[in-house]
């Protein structure tokens, strides 16, 4: 039995119209994956912003220093994660749009180009990773990362 192109395998409609793109399982999976990554990044960004505020404005110097340590540790991680995932997400969006994703009509190709450069800005992610591993993780004899791991568990 042939199915009409543009109809999902689980389509209930018998008429000739195509289904919405979200009805296709692979597209739905891709969109939900993109959404979950973005929401996770947003939550991490809010947490890091809160730690930045604490590091600048808290009355207690010990708490202020701990927050500053977390910001110092997590900034290169967040930069690398957000820029790498941004490139992946826009690439996936281009895939979802199919051939239209490569045309200027939809704007996805411009977003992809704009996002592809971000891992290079402000120091490439590989240079940031070297700085993280060889300088920030061993800073204060590794106490910062130990503290961070213990609050995360």
Regions found by a protein language model. Name each.
Residues 1-153:
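Flavin-dependent oxidoreductase catalytic core characteristic
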């Amino acid at each position: 039995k042939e199915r009409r192109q543009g109809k999902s395998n689980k389509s209930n409609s018998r008429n000739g119209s195509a289904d919405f793109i979200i009805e296709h399982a692979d597209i739905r999976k891709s969109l939900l994956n993109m959404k979950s990554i973005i929401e996770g990044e947003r939550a991490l960004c809010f947490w890091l912003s809160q730690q930045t505020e604490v590091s600048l404005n808290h009355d207690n110097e010990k708490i202020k220093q701990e927050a500053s340590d977390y910001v110092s540790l997590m900034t290169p991680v967040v930069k690398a994660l957000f820029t790498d995932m941004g490139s992946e997400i826009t690439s996936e969006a281009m895939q979802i749009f199919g051939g239209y994703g490569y045309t200027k009509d939809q704007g996805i190709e411009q977003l992809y180009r704009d996002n592809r450069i971000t891992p290079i800005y402000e120091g490439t992610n590989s240079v940031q990773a070297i700085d993280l591993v060889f300088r920030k993780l061993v800073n204060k004899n590794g106490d910062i990362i130990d503290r961070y791991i213990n609050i995360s568990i």
